């Protein structure tokens, strides 16, 4: 039986796979251990890890809310953890947040429009654009080689944090992050 839904935000298609905006789905790829996600009739790809259902919405970021909401309804699950990029956090930073605003993140706005704002988020810091690059171009671009090293380690830690849902729920995720030395702090 599914107890938690963990949704990794991102855009569909191989051209977006390595972009900053897709770090939420990158975390799910680590958690899957190479297993293939299956398509669900609610326009999601999913993989079950026992009581945790990993979900990749098969929709663009700003349309992810309806597909996540329909899967939650289908499985009668009320506990949601959303994994997403955050430009307001330095590269390599992780933060857990329960509820609150969207900070202009269109994926979160779509989810909040469908479900309200009382869901958990694991924010993955991607930093801010430099040299007057637009935010849209920045989040849809790939990481540099140095940034890739940092974000790869961060994504691995985010995946470990998600596994703490099994034993300790959202408190376990929050405690793991608080006790973990993150790559950006080295």
Curated annotation (Swiss-Prot):
GO MF entries: peptidyl-tRNA hydrolase activity; tRNA binding
Protein's GO biological process: protein quality control for misfolded or incompletely synthesized proteins; rescue of stalled ribosome
CC annotations in GO: cytoplasm
Active site residues of this protein: 21 (proton acceptor)
Signal sequence extent: none
Reactions this protein catalyses: an N-acyl-L-alpha-aminoacyl-tRNA + H2O = an N-acyl-L-amino acid + a tRNA + H(+)
The enzyme's E.C. designation: 3.1.1.29
Residues marked Discriminates between blocked and unblocked aminoacyl-tRNA (site): 11
Cell compartments where the protein resides: Cytoplasm
InterPro entries in alphabetical order: Pept_tRNA_hydro, Pept_tRNA_hydro_CS, Pept_tRNA_hydro_sf
Pfam families the UniProt entry points to: Pept_tRNA_hydro (PF01195)
Keywords: Cytoplasm, Hydrolase, RNA-binding, tRNA-binding
Site residues, Stabilizes the basic form of H active site to accept a proton: 85
Protein role: Hydrolyzes ribosome-free peptidyl-tRNAs (with 1 or more amino acids incorporated), which drop off the ribosome during protein synthesis, or as a result of ribosome stalling.
Subunit structure: Monomer.
Protein name in UniProt: Peptidyl-tRNA hydrolase
Annotated source species: Tropheryma whipplei (strain Twist) (Whipple's bacillus)
